[in-house]
Amino acid sequence: MSTIHPIVDQVTRRIRERSAESRAAYLEQVDAMAARPPGAQSMGCANVAHAFAGIPGGDRIRIVEEKAPNVAIVTAYNDVLSAHAPLARYPDILKDEARRLGATAQVAGGVPAMCDGVTQGAPGMELSLFSRDAIAMGTAIALSHDVFDAAMMLGICDKIVPGLLIGALHFGHLPTVFVPAGPMTSGLSNGDKAKVREQAAQGLVGRKELLAAESAAYHGEGTCTFYGTANSNQMLLEAMGLHVPGTAFINPADGERELLTREAMRSVLAITRNKRFAPIGRVVDERCIVNAMVALLATGGSTNHLIHWVAVARAAGITIDWNDFSELSGVVPLLARVYPNGSADVNQFQAAGGPGYVIGQLLKAGLMHGDVLTVRPDGLQEFARIPAVDNGQLAWHAAEVSGDLSVLRPADAPFSATGGLKLLSGNLGRSVIKVSAVPEDRHVVEAPARVFDSQEALQQAFKAGELDRDVICVVRWQGPRANGMPELHKLTPPLAVLQGKGYKVALVTDGRMSGASGKVPAAIHVSPEACVGGPLARLRDGDLVRLDAVAGTLAVLVDESEWQQRLVATMPRALRQANGRGFGRELFAGFRRHALSAEEGACTWIND
């Protein structure tokens, strides 16, 4: 095993020291829960009878009399999400495999799952970020029945995996395995789809043509094929050792998929109450979190994870921040070019070697911790392999060579010497930018600001021809406390059109962008947000703003004394009221009121 890179080691040590007190308290709770009698053995007879009244008699005998392990299944199934539609079949497969192995499994509960592709640019998007914490709560409710010896998490998409993971970590005494469903097969390329969207933004094609293109891109079961938040989730789970190795990007209809799903049950039972007892609270330690951060940077993954994984770490008693990401980004090379960071989709990424190749390269370069617990017996090295079917059985082989150097490159000959995400700071606050998706000649933009209070206002200005010039579009009142921090991906086509006309264009916002966003430089997650008096509340139309992804700065070029004397705008009352009404947004008022900043994970459940 390679010697760990000194910067990776330094960041890990700093996180460990920073988190010493909270991590110790977390592990004390995990150990106390693990020390109790397992599952139903600690419950009263009436409680036990209620828990198992609805399952087959044979399963009841196994649990009550034979004291066999009982595995909780928490599912995010619905068939609005193409990625989650295959999960309808999984509980029966997992229960069958549990019985084969002398155990039992129950669906402990279902959690909501929102498709950001459906709600993009719509009021429902303002529930999207907070759905993560609602999912975590739903996971906790499911597991609170407390009749389980292990857990399996069925979920794939944007907020679902972080929510399931946060919830599972609050039951850190349970061995836990995540079970994905894989991407849909390739349809219309992501690049061609983007071109049609830009044509539609200009009025060159109509709704019929746009819908045909979108339907050709999104055409079946599985995740979207771009490397956005959903597929970044899967890469990070592989790097954390919470999957069966190589499970992430096998298509739902591939015969290998069911074998991998069954293997997930075998894996979780293998670490349940035996010599290799590995509860999720022990698996997810500082090294595991750093491995996830490195994987994100090395693949140019979704900016959303700079929020979500801060929250995930907090759930395990670990504190990370954007400085940690920034320092790692300086030494972690970019190994992958997958849309929006390139033209390939995730199926081509998988064919080139997928997560197995990436993890193998990062381990070899000393950029990942190999000495970690995972859900497999041989540690993270097992995740540097690719699964295949040999005579009806799963077999794994080493992913040592890239199958396509235009998609995946080795660590000693990367696409870039530094990672795909970068921290920006200055008198406009702290923000992040996904540089891997932006051509280098657009990494620095200096232009007058045009300030908007909503994404709809920006779109109206674009349609009116008011933005045909060099411009930095600022969209404020989009943070967690303002309106739930929606994604503003609908702004990508009009801004890309302006950029295509030769103008210098950028977006600055305290909101989020989709993991699919790219092409146009965007300083996002600006903190502190305007709603709490952050610097964006001081900006005015015409202020000269400089976004410099090379130097890592975001600043308004105004005399400092004038800047400090500026009045801080307040969120218009009518806008605040509109953001809190309709589409169930009233129910999330408490979330908006108590949400932490983006850099703190936008958590709604931290009370210290």
Per-region residue spans from a language model:
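Acidic/charged coordination and interface sites in well-structured regions
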Residues: 89
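N-terminal small/polar loop signature for handling phosphorylated ligands or for N-terminal nucleophile
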Residues: 108-146
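Contiguous domain-boundary segments centered on the initiation and propagation of an alpha-helix
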Residues: 132-139, 144-151, 459, 463-470
